[in-house]
Amino acid sequence: AGDNVVASTDLYGGTVNLFKNTLRQQGIEVRFADPADPKNFEKLTDEKTRAYYGESCPNPYLRVFPIKEVADIGKKHGIPLIIDNTAAPVICKPLEHGAAVVMHSLTKYIAGHGTSIGGIIVDGGTFDWVKDAKRQPLFNEPDPSYNGAVWGRDVPKLTGANIPFAIRARVVLLRDLGAPLSPFNAFQIIQGLETVALRMKQHCANAEKVVKFLES
């Protein structure tokens, strides 16, 4: 309780509702920064800020989020940038621009057919979760539910990969909060995943035709 997240003002309505209401009820404050100027994120940052959050191509504004600029600010303060890349799989790669964690709603472009609901979290493996222990206490303090494991320290030792965010999400939050995919939904989503690169290419071609038509 008392922690905060600085999030973009350009977000999907369901996410805004989660941030303004549900998280607030759990004692987490979400502050909203206009991404038109990345420095707005820094202005809202204090010692209790745990993460920055944005959408690569936000619904419904479609104003491209300044991933690199905000990620650079976050690195300066020991704050990870989490990006929802639902609207731009394949064509946008937030991890290459400095994001620490990427999320997708699998229901949209990745699955492509709207028959299943699901999501994924991708830990980029590049963020230093132990550099600022006070900033990231969940990754630097012993977890009594796992015999005192310190996620930021122990996960890299055990796995050889710097993915404590993903591992903790899997073994703690999934355990306690649920939200697992059924095997059948996972199967359906995998069918869509096989063609996502081809479909995104066609989506872009179709969008370009619409733009050219409107320009004329």
Predicted regions and their residues:
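Conserved PLP-enzyme active-site core in the AAT-like
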Residues: 1-215
